[in-house]
Amino acid sequence: MTESHIDFRRAKFLISAPDIAHLDQYLPGDVGVEIAFAGRSNAGKSSALNALTEQKSLARTSKTPGRTQLINVFELDSQRRLVDLPGYGFAQVPLAMKNKWQQALGEYLQKRACLSGVVVLMDIRHPLKDLDMQMIEWAVASEIPVLALLTKSDKLAQSAKMKTVNEVRKALADFGDWVLVEPFSALKGTGKPKVLSILNEWCHPQWLRDELDTAEQSN
């Protein structure tokens, strides 16, 4: 069957949940396709989501890193969702709360069967911090593809930007095809077509294609 193009501008807020256990209570089971967005609290995750969906306030931006504690879910259609995970690595938050959030992130990556890809967002000026690597390792260990998205690329000159992109690609080369690395600017739109192409591919995992093919053949 022909792969359809997903219109990410149609994303709409579905639910918020405090952790993965509560997420299961709100969603129609561990079904469909989910793409998760994860990153440090200052990585520009909300701005990236808003830019990719062309909606100024789909994901709330905050001047206070770590304020967004909830898992926020946005619906693309009846089978596909975007999941905005809590920011990690924030400084002005109690240690117990940090540990709780990081545990929830790990549980989500390891237990959510419908997860077809994870976007790990990193400020291009400060990539590959310990928690970024942990998120990437968790995802790849669960055989979930990762897009390492280097945000705020407009902050660097072209030569410095490509130097950092190449350095990050080299650092993540051992993960093979499981990890892609791309620069991105929510402000300038740099990298947006490439990112949307990757997300669209993740929205059509092989199991879903097989399921839809079977449904077509039975009609």
From Swiss-Prot:
Cofactor: Mg(2+)
Biological process according to GO: division septum assembly
Pfam families the record matches: MMR_HSR1
GO cellular component, one term: cytosol
Top-rank taxon, per record: Bacteria
InterPro entries: G_ENGB_dom (IPR030393), GTP-bd (IPR006073), GTP-bd_ribosome_bio_YsxC (IPR019987), P-loop_NTPase (IPR027417)
Stored CDD domains: YihA_EngB (cd01876)
Alphabetized UniProt keyword annotations: Cell cycle, Cell division, GTP-binding, Magnesium, Metal-binding, Nucleotide-binding, Septation
GO molecular function: GTP binding; metal ion binding
Segments forming domain EngB-type G: 31-205
Residues that, per the record, bind Mg(2+): S46, T68
Positions of GTP binding: 39-46, 66-70, 84-87, 151-154, 184-186
Assigned protein family: Belongs to the TRAFAC class TrmE-Era-EngA-EngB-Septin-like GTPase superfamily. EngB GTPase family.
HAMAP family assigned: GTPase_EngB
Summary of the function given for this chain in its UniProt record: Necessary for normal cell division and for the maintenance of normal septation.
Designated name of the protein: Probable GTP-binding protein EngB
Organism: Shewanella putrefaciens (strain CN-32 / ATCC BAA-453)
Species classification: Bacteria, Pseudomonadati, Pseudomonadota, Gammaproteobacteria, Alteromonadales
Gene it is expressed from: engB
